[in-house]
Regions:
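Early extracytoplasmic/domain-onset interaction patches
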Residues: 1-73
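Solvent-exposed beta-hairpin/edge-strand motifs
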Residues: 71-125, 225, 229-230, 664-674, ...
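Short, hydrophobic/aromatic-enriched beta-strand segments in well-ordered soluble domains
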Residues: 55-57, 61, 74-76, 149-163, ...
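Hydrophobic alpha-helical and helix-loop surface patches within well-folded domains
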Residues: 5-23, 36, 288, 320-627, ...
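Glycine/proline-rich low-complexity spacer/linker segments in large multi-domain proteins
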Residues: 82-97, 158-220, 241, 310, ...
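Non-catalytic accessory/interaction domains
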Residues: 207-210, 231, 238-249, 254-259, ...
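A surface-exposed beta-strand-loop module
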Residues: 50, 60, 66-67, 97-176, ...
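Hydrophobic helix-coil surface modules that form long, contiguous segments used
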Residues: 191-202, 208-400, 429
Length: 753
């Protein structure tokens, strides 16, 4: 027979431990990783929306392997005409199509995207042989690169910057037609090294647009040349502030470095408005440096307002920055930098102390995207300055999420191209904690188990396991963000408990900070640091698309038969009398005038008048003999008057989970009982469990605190009860689209009339 147990260990699913990655989930004694250092010069041509650049990459081979070629990522090529990313993306036509959708299809087809490479040379200006395969480029090395050796080479390139509002994308620009200005959010803007390790060899899986990035750590020096009236935000630290900022701005910046309470405005809204009026033809070069980062991103605009505040992380000062246009106010000035600071503090508590010198939030319509020390975030009020609740909390949530990505995957550097959940899921989990610490009862979208129920009970043909490659995931947001975040919340609150979970999660973060973890490293560390066997949990939640639906089928109530004829005969007599409540018996009293035994004495015998519930001397003697043969413990049990309740459960959804029960007693007091998931170890389909209780129960509730993501609450109660589905009744169409702030303003104006 095959072992199909849901508690089967994950020996077959997880890779064999080795000198690079241990069975405990920690890096092995021969763990290594490569290094890629960059010197980059880029210039923004605002008129033509072209970015021109050149770079020197120094690649260091720390592996024990000899390398004969290098793989470089050309992510911009995903936007090249007829790229695999475009050809493999699916779309469809309907009987009605909006102009916007049709125009976007045309714009994507017509856009001349992708890197234009002018030269690929070594540092002695010798041409290097290379082959481009879609979003990957293989460079042939002049000679083999052995362990500990480095190789430097140069690439000169350019590409057309995409209009994000027309064709989408993680980076690009947003054009403000009324004033003729733009906000540039620039990333994947330079050819980048692929990762080489003992897990994948070269991770050169093509970039098709969804599965994000797998990148080695390195040091960056980046010179960014833009129009002189632009303000630039970027990964790393600004090294030439005196060349690009005026004296007042530098003075405000220095003030912000000492202000830990409120943000300080460095570039004001009035200054940004002045910058917007005229497009300078002059250029300025901003120089940034970053140490031990895996990537680099930047943003540039003359529209930017800039504010900042200091954050204390374990005695070290870290700067929180926000860059946003006037269109972002009042939301951004009030919240963005404060949210950045809050996020750094909470994530540092639950993972590792934030190690970088700054974290930046940049306003960018319609996207949320992350890079080391910088992220691009949506959240724009209405033109009148009001905003909906959804806009406010959506903005705060996306800032927390994208700033949180500094930890996952920028520091704890997982393979996004392979496993989206390892950064998005873990990040969304800590995002939930951060949101709840920002505001009590914060309306978090993801994290609470009941929020994932609709997804998990859906059609299984449209649901893939969490352990699915990024490009093949179905229902991307629920699969890679919502479900893993929910799973970790359930581990923390229900399976492991906060103390064990938090220690283990922090251990994983510390072990794999500035390294490249895999799913096995995470799974093994969580068990290693807690002494909790979680293989059943990983198997069910991460390797299947099963859901939670545990049914409380039946509750049977038992009482001990004392053997005492005086007691038991009375009970039996009452039970027999209850049977006579049958309506036919009561009607027979009037419809049957006389029975045969009432008419004819000859039809009467012993049993006609025999009372089986009358105690006689023999019954008493039998009872006394029975009692005499009992020891004291047995006599106590006999006298205890305990209630024995046998509960029957079925596992309908397939996921084995802990059983949480709330008993309500006849005196309306309650008791909660928590049973580990291992109760299903012998039979994962149906189980019975007996509970010995002092008081009678009137109600049993399964999963009373909605902590297991059970998809069907209608089979969770005894006595059974249905949860009502509420419906809304309306008259005609509600055409009022104002947000609550607009309505409040209108109400105030009306009351003042």
């Amino acid at each position: 027979n095959l072992n199909n147990s849901k508690f089967k260990q994950l020996y077959e699913e997880l890779p064999t431990p080795n000198v690079y990655r241990t069975a405990s989930g920690a890096p092995g004694h021969e763990y290594y990783q490569q290094k890629a250092d960059y010197e980059i010069n880029v210039e923004l041509d605002e008129e033509k929306n072209i970015l021109k650049g050149n770079e020197i990459i120094t690649y260091t081979n720390n592996s024990p392997d000899v390398l004969n070629y290098l793989w470089i990522q050309l992510d911009q090529n995903v936007r090249a005409k007829n790229s695999h990313g475009q050809l493999t993306s699916t779309n469809s036509m309907n009987n009605k199509m909006s102009f916007r959708n049709i125009k976007r299809m045309h714009d994507r087809m017509d856009f001349d995207g992708g890197f234009k490479l002018e030269e690929v040379k070594d540092t002695y200006n010798n041409d290097l042989s290379y082959v481009i395969n879609e979003t990957m480029m293989r460079i042939e090395l002049p000679k083999s690169l052995r362990k500990g050796q480095s190789f430097s080479f140069k690439i000169k390139y350019s590409y057309n910057i995409n209009d994000r509002m027309k064709i989408g994308g993680r980076s690009g620009y947003e054009y403000f037609e009324k004033e003729g200005n733009a906000i540039y959010t620039i990333a994947q803007f330079f050819p980048r090294m692929a990762v080489y390790n003992e897990v994948e060899g070269w991770q050169n899986k093509q970039f098709l647009g969804r599965g994000e990035f797998t990148l080695p750590f390195g040091d960056y020096k980046v010179n960014i040349t833009v129009p002189s009236d632009h303000i630039v935000a970027a990964t790393g630290e600004l090294k030439n502030a005196s060349s690009v900022l005026n004296k007042n701005q530098i003075k405000r910046w220095e003030k912000a470095k000492k202000n830990f309470i409120d943000p300080v405005i460095i570039v004001s809204q009035e200054e940004a408005k002045e910058n917007e009026k005229e497009k300078s033809k002059l250029k300025k070069t901003w120089t940034f440096e970053a140490k031990n980062v895996r990537d680099f991103g930047w943003a540039s605009s003359r529209k930017f307002i800039w504010d900042a505040m200091a954050v204390d992380i374990s005695g070290k000062t870290v700067m929180a920055y926000s860059y946003y246009p006037k269109e972002g106010n009042p939301l951004w000035e009030q919240y963005s930098t404060r949210v950045v600071a809050h996020t750094l503090k909470v994530y540092s508590e639950y993972t590792i102390d934030y190690i970088y010198p700054q974290a930046t939030s940049v306003h960018a319509k319609s996207i949320g995207m992350e890079y080391p020390m910088i992220c691009f975030n949506f959240g724009r009020p209405e033109s009148d300055g009001t905003y909906s609740k959804r806009t406010k909390y959506g903005m705060i949530g996306v800032i927390i999420h994208e700033v949180g990505h500094n930890f996952f995957p920028m520091i704890i550097n997982s393979d996004e191209r392979q496993w989206t959940w390892m950064d998005e899921g873990l990040n969304t989990f800590v995002q939930y904690i951060t949101e709840q610490e920002f505001e009590r009862n914060y309306p978090s979208r993801r994290g609470p188990p009941n929020n994932i129920v609709e997804y998990m009970k859906g059609d299984k043909s449209g649901i893939s396991p969490i352990m699915t490659n990024s490009e093949s995931i179905l229902q991307f947001g629920n699969n890679a963000y919502g479900k893993p975040a929910t799973a970790l919340n359930i581990l923390r609150e229900t399976v492991m408990g906060r103390e064990l979970f938090d220690y283990s999660f922090k251990t994983y973060s510390e072990r794999w900070a500035f390294k490249h973890p895999t799913p096995a490293d995470f799974f093994r560390t969580m068990e290693d640091a807690s002494a909790v066997d979680l293989d059943w949990f990983w198997r069910g939640w991460f390797y299947t698309n099963d859901h939670v639906d545990i049914s409380l089928d039946k509750v049977n109530w038992f009482k001990i038969n004392t053997g005492n004829p005086e007691i038991e005969n009375t009970i039996s007599k009452n039970q027999e009398e209850n049977k006579k409540r049958y309506i036919g018996i009561s009607r027979n009293k009037s419809s049957i005038k006389k029975t045969i035994t009432e008419i004819d004495d000859q039809s009467i015998d012993f049993y006609t008048t025999y009372d089986p519930f009358k105690t006689n001397i023999l019954d008493e003697e039998d009872y006394n003999k029975y009692i005499k043969n009992l020891d004291e413990d047995e006599k106590e049990i006999l006298k205890s008057e305990k209630n024995y309740y046998e509960l029957n459960f079925s596992n309908i959804g397939g996921l084995v989970m802990p059983i949480i029960l709330e008993f309500t007693f006849v005196d309306l007091t309650t008791e909660v009982v928590r049973i580990p998931a291992e109760i299903w170890k012998k039979n994962s389909n149906q189980i019975k469990k007996v509970f010995i209780l002092d008081k009678e129960i009137v109600k049993v509730q399964l999963d009373p605190f909605l902590e297991t993501a059970d998809v069907n609450l209608n089979n969770n109660s005894w006595p059974a009860r249905n949860e009502p589905t509420r419906f809304q009744i309306y008259k005609g169409k509600d055409r009022n689209n104002e947000n609550p702030m607009q309505r409040a303003i209108r109400a105030e104006e009306k009351s003042n009339e």
